[in-house]
A protein has these predicted regions:
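Motif-centric detector for short Cys/His coordination patterns
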Residues: 1-93
Length: 93
């Protein structure tokens, strides 16, 4: 089972997500915004309002939408680019 430790916005509906194993994956959610809970995420300014909820170890939005960390890991593509601190949410200080 995976969990999200950090996430940053790239562009469109793409996020760069770091998981507990330090694997960084680029996740494109553009094809996964079906259903009433995900409808608000189609609005890019709203989509960009995600945070990392460390109680459930995944990315969440203000309306309660979230994706399973295992699903995010599965659909993500490995990425060697560093996560830029200014754009990152979720790090514990």
């Amino acid at each position: 089972m995976h969990y999200v430790t950090e996430a940053s916005y790239i562009d469109g509906y793409r996020l760069r997500i770091r998981f507990e194993d330090d694997e960084v994956r680029v996740v494109d959610l553009s094809e996964h915004l079906d259903g009433p809970v995900f409808e608000p995420l189609k609005d890019l300014p709203f989509f960009r309002r995600f945070t990392v909820n460390h109680d459930i170890d995944t990315v969440v939005w203000p309306n309660g939408a979230d994706f399973s960390p295992d699903f995010l890991y599965e659909i993500g593509e490995s990425d060697s680019e560093p996560v830029h601190p200014a754009d990152t949410v979720g790090r514990r200080g």
